[in-house]
Curated annotation (Swiss-Prot):
It is an enzyme of class 7 (translocase). It comes from Helianthus annuus (Common sunflower). The lineage of its organism: Eukaryota, Viridiplantae, Streptophyta, Embryophyta, Tracheophyta. This is NAD(P)H-quinone oxidoreductase subunit 6, chloroplastic. Its main location: plastid. GO terms for molecular function: NADH dehydrogenase (ubiquinone) activity; quinone binding.
Length: 176
């Protein structure tokens, strides 16, 4: 990222402090859930370092693989092992559940009403002639991004939703 020197140095110091605090949180926090979230902070700061060094594909891979998969797996394992400790004061329905339900339902309804009204022609469908001409001018990581955002957009989103639902279901089963 081409930033002026002072802003770049400030971001480096800020991310360095985030790494140090996250690392200390992983080691010093007594609750393993908080330690796992601190590890997620460390992974996010590392990916932001990659963005500052103009390695955008590596940063995206860092976020998807480490934060999105490894850290979630660690949190799932910790919740599965310590399930009896957290389910002692289990309430069937709380205020937070109601607020979450209202927010999720309103988001779902807004998406259902917005998606059919959106013109997807310019977003998804691109001409093959332009792709053939541009393939020599772009790198492999840009081609991966173009294919994920054009040809494989809907399957990519469906897979991410299926994985999210499976993760939530696994956490719900582990907590009972």
């Amino acid at each position: 990222m081409d930033l002026p020197g002072l802003i770049h140095d400030f971001l480096l110091v800020f991310l360095g402090l985030g790494l140090i605090l996250g690392g200390l949180g992983v080691v010093l926090l007594a609750n393993p859930i908080y330690s796992a979230f601190s590890l997620g902070l460390v992974f996010v700061c590392i990916s932001l370092f990659y963005i500052l060094s103009n390695s955008h594909f590596v940063a995206a891979a860092q976020l998807l693989i480490y934060v999105g998969a490894i850290n979630v797996l660690i949190i799932f394992a910790v919740m599965f092992i310590n399930g009896s400790e957290y389910s002692k004061d289990f309430h069937l329905w709380t205020v937070g559940d109601g607020v979450t339900s209202v927010v999720c339902t309103s988001l779902f309804v807004s998406l259902i009403t917005t998606i059919p009204d959106t013109s997807w022609y310019g977003i998804i469908w691109t001409t093959k002639a332009n792709q053939i001409i541009e393939q020599d001018l772009i790198s492999n990581s840009q081609q991966i991004g173009i294919h994920l955002s054009t040809d494989f957009f809907i399957p990519f989103e469906f897979i991410s939703i299926i994985l999210l639902v499976a993760l939530i279901g696994a956490i719900a089963v582990a907590r009972q």
